[in-house]
Amino acid sequence: MKYFVVLVVLALILAITVGPSDAVFIDILDKMENAIHKAAQAGIGIAKPIEKMILPK
């Protein structure tokens, strides 16, 4: 997680210094972040029912 935050900060610095013409890198990072977020949500969605089967209340 720390590496991703560092990568995002560096990408923001790059976008500010070079201007919007080279800010395509930011779009790629945004798409990666959204994909990771969706994968994490899917993983949690799969893990919750399994957890409920293993640890009934």
From Swiss-Prot:
**Where is the protein found, in the record's own terms?**
Secreted
| BP GO terms, sorted | defense response to Gram-positive bacterium; innate immune response; male-specific antibacterial humoral response
Keyword Phosphoprotein included in the entry's annotation = no
Q: Which GO terms describe its cellular component?
A: extracellular region
Where in the sequence is the signal peptide annotated?
1-23
Which Pfam families does the UniProt record give? Cecropin
Query: What are the UniProt keywords, alphabetically?
Result: Antibiotic, Antimicrobial, Immunity, Innate immunity, Secreted, Signal
Task: Tell what triggers its expression.
Answer: In response to mating.
- Expressed in which tissues: Ejaculatory duct of adult males.
TM ranges are: none
The record's annotation in InterPro entries points to: Cecropin
State the superkingdom. Eukaryota
Primary subcellular site in the record, as a coarse category: secreted
User: What is the annotated role of this protein in its UniProt record?
Assistant: Male-specific peptide with moderate activity against Gram-positive bacteria.
So what family is this one in?
Answer: Belongs to the andropin family.
Protein name listed in UniProt = Andropin
Q: Which organism is it from?
A: Drosophila mauritiana
